[in-house]
């Protein structure tokens, strides 16, 4: 199994290293024969000797073309002859490429920016993560001492925790009497002990949570400060910290550094990405949070260190559990894309598509288009019409079916052969013309991207059939990871067409796909309403919610299934409408904002949730009660009564203070805040009193009654004393409770002022309150 590749230099020549695990053993294979190259298109082939004379300097050495050969390629499906220019060293390529491009005989150069080790994987057809090797994993985490205003890495590391499949332990340098804590004499000894643990356990995978941007950089800084050689690589090297966009990325040679943070950001949509929030979202179990100031206080006072050690150990355990959960999917993506898991786990979906296409292009002898320069990038900036949205029908509705297209955009790309190489191509016998935008796509041959996408969808269907047939739970799970990886990739192709930095960028393709998408969903709505008596309540891009006013549940379900049998034969190619679900009741507010309840009583909301930290418990609780009243009981008036009751209790100071606490996270150094929100104001006052505040600290506060700015009236939650303080009832009504329910009840004709007990009485809203869709 290939874990990763890189190259080193021996006697001025590049040597590819392939890090592998075979038969349970780690090994490094070397290849000294692979040469760096790129392609050049010439106006006149006779100029090649002149081009070979172009030189550049790199570190005082003259760089030039080592040799050249003429090759037959295809560019966007059309035959083309180009020159393949070879060089002595990968670093020669960036040194000389602009000079060769500037030569009068050169039309353009291609594939000059593909990193050497990645090029090797592509050209040799090697697939990382392929095979059945059992990889060993170790997760680790650090706790540090931080004071406001200190430079990063100044404070000591207090604890290093680690976990694998057999144990979870903490190393520290203060006396803590717990069975899983190893106590050493100094910070230096602690770091050296941890490095020894890694060498002895020799894991194939190191798992961190934001290790790219924190743990490794902090360890490196402390190692430099304390004179420790920070060797973690299997070749004896130190971790390599490099910039990747606006973040950092850390490589450990011979081991896969699996940072969960970018993976989870790409995979799960959460209001906050603390380790605690992620763990609860994934496993449904809470994890205690010990804040930075609590760690500092415990360390400096010596009291409560057991709690900090337990927290540190749990950090490592939780990171290990999350790593085991997410690693198999990333391994499948790595196999599918054909690049290392280290790269794939840090890639956007657009980059995943691009690396997949680069590998397939090489296999099909296609020359990859160049990435855009700044001028071209500016030209590409600009939008196009998206998916169709039908504005929602207001009110409360019963017996709702949800129908949607299976893989709408991938199906359109394949069905209509939407691809840069088929776009407006002259001399074709047959074209598909996109509605509204009028772009033509040749149907005489399968386009590069549609054919690849077709293969992917076909493979996914085969895997799903295998999943149904197998009785082995492990095989079923692995197949599921594979089909999900394919789904992620396949669903990213449409977005890739419109991605301005893409090599195979094609705005005409992207806007044609959405134009066909609009045509098909509008046609489905028309047929559903006119021929089957449905009322479409809301539609968005590839799916719709609909009911038959006055019909019971069984009738609605039966008619929906009859409609699918009627409509699917009318849809071209791979397009297929599916029955996705049935809901007992629901309401639709605006675009992408609705709530429905299924037959098991499960409420699903979209765009209405308030799960961010900066909502108090009273706001969350009120919204949940309002949704339950409307969806479970079908009673909008009850929902309004709940809101009035809560606002009344707030006004009369009858709500317990624990329900009023607002939590907000400090995301940067306090001195970097321009605007001072309530949490920042509280944090600054705490810092002035000696409390340690750093990025990541969560401030919990309550807003008091009074005049002046909110920030001046916010106090730490644990300082609130009901005998001395009064909360600001008006603030909680206007900024917490009403915003949490206002957009829901607005769908039934209520205004904000209708929801307060002390304001105007309820006016005639019978038309809104009547449950629609009933007999």
From Swiss-Prot:
Gene3D superfamilies in the record: DNA polymerase family B, C-terminal domain (1.10.132.60), DNA Polymerase, chain B, domain 1 (3.30.342.10), Helix hairpin bin (1.10.287.690), Palm domain of DNA polymerase (3.90.1600.10), Ribonuclease H-like superfamily/Ribonuclease H (3.30.420.10)
SUPFAM superfamilies (UniProt xref): DNA/RNA polymerases, Ribonuclease H-like
A biological process from GO: DNA-templated DNA replication
Reaction(s) this enzyme catalyzes, per UniProt: DNA(n) + a 2'-deoxyribonucleoside 5'-triphosphate = DNA(n+1) + diphosphate
CDD domains: DNA_polB_Kod1_like_exo, POLBc_B3
Top-level taxon: Archaea
GO molecular function terms noted in the UniProt entry: DNA binding; DNA-directed DNA polymerase activity; nucleotide binding
EC number: 2.7.7.7
Family: Belongs to the DNA polymerase type-B family.
Protein's name according to its UniProt entry: DNA polymerase
Top-level taxonomy: Archaea, Methanobacteriati, Methanobacteriota, Thermococci, Thermococcales
Encoding gene per record: pol
